[in-house]
């Protein structure tokens, strides 16, 4: 590195479904790839083919026919550290093509991430990757920063988990955070199920990816579910066609809005939990009465599963029905919300005031992994 050159920090948002990684100061992540590690099902048959012992991300996805695929992050929380290390290695060396020992690294974590997990992340960064400095930030807090706020409640829904996180003056309020194990992956499963009922069978992991694409391209949230069902029954105005990779064209109608309806009515997939609107309301009600007004007026959506058209209007309608009648309710759905956690990290890591917040290697050497609880909150 030249002396005068500013070293850019790396920002890595590890989601259950996708890793988003890039450089602080950029307006979007450079690398976005599936959080998957695949290992060969069979010993290498073809000698000299240079078969790797593990594949990560897109390469694992494309070779899935011969691999066993695993997601090291379940419901937002890292459960398999060996595979997680492979994902980070792939992120630094193959995707971003940087030497981690030359850049500070900002990582993200799920709300209510166990303490031992934060320590393990910290340890791997300093000991395996020899980073000069690092920081761990809560995902929902970064999304709120990305929306230009420091107070509000974030509904963050990704592939593996959904959280409602009330934040006041930049600090998440842990006692009021609620977690819902219902997210994008479950919606894809449900879409597979209701398409099967229509006579289109999707079963394999490869076909699941097709259904995910159908969901992302065609699904939307109905403002009034019952009325939408009536419309779907009486006319074909809501029907859309989709071309499968083999050229076959399928038609879908009510499935388009029945799929994301699960977010508001988890009973549709046999879950007893409250929907996202009620969970948001319950989260607000766990907060001090004095700050509720600020939360109702700043409900920020974040994550890929909040990308359905119509979700903000429906959310607004449902919360209005639950809240006190005089309350002003505002649901904010930033267009870039699929990546707002990463964007918030990019903003935070490039602030001059943040530079004293990094955990330096010297501090880690002195205090060990527990330093993370003192410096990151």
Curated annotation (Swiss-Prot):
Enzyme nomenclature, EC number: 3.6.4.-
Function, in words: Actins are highly conserved proteins that are involved in various types of cell motility and are ubiquitously expressed in all eukaryotic cells.
Intracellular or extracellular location(s): Cytoplasm, Cytoskeleton
Keywords assigned by UniProt, alphabetized: ATP-binding, Cytoplasm, Cytoskeleton, Hydrolase, Nucleotide-binding
Listed name of the protein: Actin
Family statement: Belongs to the actin family.
Upper lineage: Eukaryota, Viridiplantae, Streptophyta, Coleochaetophyceae, Coleochaetales
Single Gene Ontology MF annotation: hydrolase activity
PANTHER family: ACTIN
Organism (species): Coleochaete scutata
One Pfam family per UniProt: Actin
Main location: cytoplasm
Manganese keyword on record: no
UniProt entry tagged with the keyword Transport: no
Recorded GO CC terms: cytoplasm; cytoskeleton
């Amino acid at each position: 590195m030249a002396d005068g050159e500013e070293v850019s920090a790396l920002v890595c948002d590890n989601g259950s479904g996708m890793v988003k990684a890039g450089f602080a100061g950029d307006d979007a992540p450079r690398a976005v790839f599936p959080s998957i590690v695949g290992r060969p099902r069979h010993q290498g048959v073809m000698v000299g083919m240079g078969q790797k012992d593990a594949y990560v991300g897109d390469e694992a996805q494309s070779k899935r026919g011969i691999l066993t695929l695993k997601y090291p992050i379940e419901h937002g929380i890292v459960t398999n550290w060996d595979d997680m290390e492979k994902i980070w290695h792939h992120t630094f060396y193959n995707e971003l093509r940087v030497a981690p020992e030359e850049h500070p690294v900002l990582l993200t974590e799920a709300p209510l991430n166990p303490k031992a997990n934060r320590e393990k992340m910290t340890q791997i960064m300093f000991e395996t990757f020899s980073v000069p400095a690092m920081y761990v930030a809560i995902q929902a807090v970064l999304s709120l920063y990305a929306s230009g706020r420091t107070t509000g409640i974030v509904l963050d829904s990704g592939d593996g988990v959904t959280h409602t996180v009330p934040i006041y003056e930049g600090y998440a309020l842990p006692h009021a955070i609620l977690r819902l194990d219902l997210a994008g992956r479950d919606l894809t499963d449900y879409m597979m199920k209701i398409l099967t009922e229509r006579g289109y069978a999707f079963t394999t992991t490869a076909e699941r990816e097709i259904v995910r694409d159908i969901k992302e391209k065609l699904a939307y949230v109905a403002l009034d579910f019952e009325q939408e069902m009536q419309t779907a029954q009486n006319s074909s105005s809501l029907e859309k066609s989709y071309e499968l990779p083999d050229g076959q064209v399928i038609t879908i109608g009510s499935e388009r809005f029945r799929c994301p309806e699960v977010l508001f009515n988890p009973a549709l997939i046999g879950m007893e939990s409250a929907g996202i609107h009620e969970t948001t309301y319950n989260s607000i009600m766990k907060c001090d009465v004095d700050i509720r007004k600020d939360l109702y007026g700043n409900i920020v959506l974040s994550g890929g599963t909040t990308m359905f058209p119509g979700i903000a209007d429906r959310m607004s309608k449902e919360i209005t029905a639950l809240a006190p009648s005089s309350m002003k309710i505002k649901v904010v759905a930033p267009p870039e919300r699929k990546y707002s956690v990463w964007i918030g990290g990019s903003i935070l890591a490039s602030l001059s005031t943040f530079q004293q917040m990094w955990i330096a290697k010297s501090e880690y050497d002195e205090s060990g992994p527990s330093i993370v609880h003192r410096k990151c909150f």
